[in-house]
Amino acid sequence: MKVLFAGGGTGGHLYPGVAMASELKKVVPGVEISFAGTPAGIEATEVPRLGYPLHLLPVRGLKRGRSLRDLAANVGVLKDFGSSLMQAFSIIRKETPNVVVGTGGYVSAPLLLAAQLSGCKTLIQEQNAFPGVTTRMLARMASEVHLSFAESRKFFGDSKNVFVTGNPAREFPAEPRQACLDFFGLRGDLPTLLVFGGSRGARAINNALLRFCGRLEGKINLIWQTGSLDAERVTAEVSSSSTRWIGPYIQEMGKAYGAADLVLCRAGASSLAELTNLGKPSVLAPYPYAAADHQRHNARALVNAGAAIMIEDTNLADDASLETILDLLGDSERLDRMGHASRSEGYPGAAAELAGRIIALSKS
């Protein structure tokens, strides 16, 4: 059995494919797995590190502006897409995959299209509440389309090939809360706020925390992943203490989640999948410049479910936002309700279920 995963650019489009690949390796002895991506994406370094073959295509994303510069750049983008499509046909002929799985990002488009035109089975896995351009364009020709949010179903009418299976995410073993707090050197008698904005960080979130940090001292525990870009600036102003753990990156994310009563973060699909699988209540600050504003759509899905509240990026440093967070941390009953609502939105078996669908398609 051969499976080709096409997607990347960011971890949010790559790691769902990695999770499905890991599940396939568990249940299909001798399965041959390869990936396709771009030289500029995270997959260029991460996929070889994981030991999978990688095909690189020159495809780029379209500029969304209307300036002459953007229009001129898009001429080159279309040329690169044509070249990538020809390479994709060559990859399909050479690899002869049983199934091509698209996990989003512009790199998935030429591989999915070439596979569909070659008569190869295709599965699209859409992470975001508002489906991406590739998903919307190629869904009708796909063998199956799998969504992460139930509310995304409305974009596909009565299509019989569309299913809601959740977003494959990292799995974390359950650990006692006190043991997790001890790991970070924090007090057991205070509620804990976990804050992160991705591996590079989120400047608006970090700025808000810098403004409020002194007022949080002694009221809550804080686990704060600053990201690599802001680490030096933040640690120059604020240091760790008995109620604060501050660092550029959290290696033991399972322990951070285990300690957390509330999470403040962006609204990327992978983060939300982890939150809902673990049943964590959250305060979401969608990245305002995400393509098609997809993070806002993701956040709205959890807000509508009662699992989260949303704060606009521009309002993060307002006193009202601080009061909202402190009020939540002081209301254990509301946190419990939000946690139950969050868990009801999770799909902890998503990777295994999707691996099963890939296997079924390969045999059909």
Swiss-Prot record:
Keyword Cell membrane annotated: yes
EC number, UniProt record: 2.4.1.227
Membrane topology summary: Peripheral membrane protein
Principal place of residence: membrane
Keyword annotations of the record: Cell cycle, Cell division, Cell inner membrane, Cell membrane, Cell shape, Cell wall biogenesis/degradation, Glycosyltransferase, Membrane, Peptidoglycan synthesis, Transferase
Membrane-traversing stretches: none
InterPro entries cross-referenced by the UniProt entry: GlcNAc_MurG (IPR006009), Glyco_trans_28_C (IPR007235), GlycoTrans_28_N (IPR004276)
Catalytic activity: di-trans,octa-cis-undecaprenyl diphospho-N-acetyl-alpha-D-muramoyl-L-alanyl-D-glutamyl-meso-2,6-diaminopimeloyl-D-alanyl-D-alanine + UDP-N-acetyl-alpha-D-glucosamine = di-trans,octa-cis-undecaprenyl diphospho-[N-acetyl-alpha-D-glucosaminyl-(1->4)]-N-acetyl-alpha-D-muramoyl-L-alanyl-D-glutamyl-meso-2,6-diaminopimeloyl-D-alanyl-D-alanine + UDP + H(+)
PANTHER family in the cross-refs: GLYCOSYLTRANSFERASE, UDP-N-ACETYLGLUCOSAMINE--N-ACETYLMURAMYL-(PENTAPEPTIDE) PYROPHOSPHORYL-UNDECAPRENOL N-ACETYLGLUCOSAMINE TRANSFERASE 1
Family in the record: Belongs to the glycosyltransferase 28 family. MurG subfamily.
Listed NCBIfam families: murG (TIGR01133)
Name of this chain's protein: UDP-N-acetylglucosamine--N-acetylmuramyl-(pentapeptide) pyrophosphoryl-undecaprenol N-acetylglucosamine transferase
